[in-house]
């Protein structure tokens, strides 16, 4: 009987590895540009109860505009690499998980300006970083556990900070917000 009770204990800690891909929405100067957002991550989940848990982890995310950009010819599309640290509260209902929380993002590969037009005042920005090295967003997510170890889901990142880096030049700098929506496939270890 003691062996049966030992195996019946609920798991407090869960390890997850996941990949995600989807749509990047780069909102700048009042217009939207779209691109691709891709992510590889690890999450450590701590279960408080059968219904509630908190998950944190690390993910590498690439946001690239140039795959679908209308600025492909003669303009400057964006391409960034981030280290993301999510902190999500999660509610578990049968096979479904619903999560919400902040994501702290550190830009580890920043894109720089490349303006081709010689008559543009923005050519002074050439070679300078486009965005700030840190920002945070809000991440809602929904997951469906297809088995004990595999899950599918959808998550989004809603950028809450203006990430545009400004310089001391006599030109206007607009606001830039990064958002994405991704499909996620994960393995619970």
Residue locations for each model-derived region?
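Transmembrane beta-strands of outer-membrane beta-barrel pores
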Residues: 21-27, 60-64, 93-95, 104-110, ...
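Residues that define the transmembrane beta-barrel architecture of outer-membrane proteins
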Residues: 11-13, 32-38, 79-83, 94, ...
């Amino acid at each position: 009987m003691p062996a049966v009770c030992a195996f019946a204990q609920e798991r407090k800690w869960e390890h997850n590895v996941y990949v995600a891909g989807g749509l990047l929405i780069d909102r700048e100067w009042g217009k939207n540009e779209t691109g691709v957002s891709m992510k590889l991550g690890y999450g450590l989940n701590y279960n408080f109860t059968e219904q509630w848990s908190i998950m944190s982890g690390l993910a590498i995310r690439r946001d690239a505009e140039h795959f679908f950009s209308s600025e492909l010819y003669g303009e400057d599309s964006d391409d960034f690499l981030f280290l993301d640290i999510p902190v999500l509260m999660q509610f578990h209902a049968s096979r479904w998980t619903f999560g919400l929380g902040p994501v702290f993002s550190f830009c580890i590969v920043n894109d720089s300006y490349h303006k081709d037009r010689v008559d543009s005042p923005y050519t002074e920005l050439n070679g300078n970083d486009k965005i700030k090295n840190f920002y945070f967003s809000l991440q809602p997510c929904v997951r469906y556990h297809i088995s004990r170890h595999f899950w599918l889901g959808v998550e989004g990142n809603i950028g809450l900070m203006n990430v545009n880096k400004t310089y001391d030049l006599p030109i206007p700098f607009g606001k830039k917000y990064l958002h994405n929506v991704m499909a996620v496939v994960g393995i619970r270890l």
